[in-house]
Structures are given as structure tokens and as C-alpha cells.
Amino acid sequence: MADNQNTWKRPDPNAKYTITQYLDVVNANNERVVAGGFEKYMLENQFNAEFLGSATMTPTKIMDDMRTAIYEVGVIGQVEEYRDDFTQKQVPAIDRLTLHLSNDYQKEVSISVFDKKTGAQWNDFLAKTLANLEVVKQDQINLINIDAIYQSCLATGNYIIIPELSPDRVESLTDDERLKIVEKIYRKAKQVTKSRTKFNLGADPNKLRFVLSDDAALVVLTAKTYKIRDGQAYSDYSTKGLGSSSQYMGDYLGMPIYSSAYLGEDYLKSTDQKYTSNLIRDYKFSKLSGIITMPETTICLKQELMLTTFQSPTSKSHQLIHNSWSMNSAVFPQFAHLNFVILNDKPTKDEINKARSNLYSQFPSLYAEFKTPISEDSKITEVNKANWRGLSTYK
């Protein structure tokens, strides 16, 4: 094992590689890893795969049609040790390409080093894949996230209507009315919480293979609706020295409540000044007073977190990664029940029909899944041969 480790060429984390250059290193390492029997460990410990490294490709120059994009590769993680209990050789294969948004909301493509393909195959595959991806402008990402949840909830009927939250009524509510509304939102959020079980992965197979656990829903309201929590009950809580109104919400409701400046407004491509030059469509949120969702369906988990978790020693085996993956899960059929929207007016029939016609089709998803695993000698020449799962562009 020591010889195998010493001959492994470690990519420089501080260097920038072209796709071809990085894949040359990947292929060379794969040959040595296969010779070392790493695959048996992979097959026997599927929930605790020890990543040898990963690359993140971010665009440095993007033309309008995305077909002449120039990508650089940055190395984001390496493992420096091998296990010594390998006895059988297997050929590793991976059948999916993971796509996600970085913290800067740039499209990223992650490839693990045990993807056993030739550099030419990956180049051909990536070129066709990236050509079909859409460039999402950073200043619209919040609008797109909200619209994804909003439209999916209209289509599935996952909404509650509270007329008292309309802009012309919400500020004149009595304390009793506010408390009743908060409790109504709480009951719905509790229902969402109970309908979801979180699947976690752990680092040490001897201590944690996987665990099922509950998590609290997240409530996001308009700025005006957010003020409904400023009733007398919350003031009494603070007066008694028990904490702030925010702490009261945490203690009483057991879930976080936040405000969002994006809710309760319409963003029109033809008239909106802030987004005049690049708004890709109209976003009509005037009826949207709040969203009830699960945190892991609205945030993006970085690939580094997964790598760190898998690579962590036994002392860090308490680290978990969540299988509720990114905001796009809001429009996956299996995650649709994890989101509810709070409306201040009844949606029209046309709004519901439009949402239903676009359900599960108008938002980019996270990965492409192939009908069959791609073997070492496969030649990816036609993108249509793959079963693209949700790679349709945003309409």
C-alpha cells in the first residue's frame, strides 16, 4: 500500500487545470487505485465511501449560447491514506454526474476520481452537458428559488389561505387575531415537519451507517406578515425576562421564523427598474405571504461538506450530511409534500392550471441519471442516449 500511495500523483489544490489536464491525473490515479483493491472497500461500505478527491469546474468565460464556455478545474479535497484490508479487485463505476450551485450561485460540475472513464469520453460528455445548461443570473436566484416552491405548491394544492394577511389588513390585526394566525401557521408547519424524515449519512461505519431523524420546518414570511409575532403574548414573554420575541417563537413553536423582502411583491419584466436589463420572466408574488418548507430543500450543500464528512476520522463521526438536496428538491415529486405556501388571496384557476402544466419540468435539477451505468469502454457520442433527469432549462 505504501508504494501505491507514494506513486499516486496528488493534484495541486492551488493550481488551475483544464478539464483534460485534470482528467489525465484522474485516469492515472484510477489505474493505481484499481490495482490496490480500493473497489472492495467501496462496494462493502457504500454509505461510507472514502473519496480520493474531487474537482469543481467553474466557468471563467461564458458566451451567450453557453456552447463556447471556458471552464477551469479546481481541486477541493484529497485523502492521504489507504486502508490495508483490500483482498479483492472490482471495477468501480459511477452512473451519475452531480450538478449543483455554489455559494456564489454559479453552476458547478463535480466529478469524483473513481469515475473510470477516459479523458476523451469525459470531455465529449461534459461539452454536451454544459451546452444544455442554462446560465442563471445571480441577482435572480432568490426569485427563482421562491417561484420554484410557489408554483409547485399551487400545482399540488399545498397552500393555505389566510385573508387577514393581505397588505391592507395585516397591520390592523388585534393581538388575539395575531396569535390565532401564528397558531394556524404553526399547525401547518408542524404537519410539514411530521411528514418528513431526514436521512443522514455518517463517517464511521462502526458507529453510524445511517440514522433517521426529524427536523423542524422553516417559516418565511413577508415583512408585514412577520410583524404578527409582535403581539401581547410575545411582549409578556420578554417582560418576564424569559427572552426576546424571537426566542419565544423558538420555545413556543419550536421552529425558526424569518422575513423575506422578496415575498408579497410582483416583479415584472416590462416595468421593474431593478431587473429591467436581465429579468428573464415575470414573478408575481403579491398573493404570497409566506412559505413553509424544510431548510435543506432551500439551501445548497457544498460538495466540500460531503467530502469532509466522508473523510473525517472516527472522532468526527458525529458529522452528518443531509439527503434533502438543494432548493431544486422543491419541485421533485418525492419532495413536493415538504413545502407549503401561505396565500392572502385565493389563486385563480388559470394560475393553478399554469402551475400544473409546468410541474416538474420548468426548473433545472441536480443530476443526470443514466439508464445503465457507463462502463470503461463506453463511447458517449449522442447526448440523447442518456436519460436526462430534469435537465430541461428554466422556461
UniProtKB/Swiss-Prot annotation:
Domain of life of the organism encoding this protein: Bacteria
Taxon lineage: Bacteria, Bacillati, Mycoplasmatota, Mycoplasmoidales, Mycoplasmoidaceae
Name the record gives this protein: Uncharacterized protein UU164
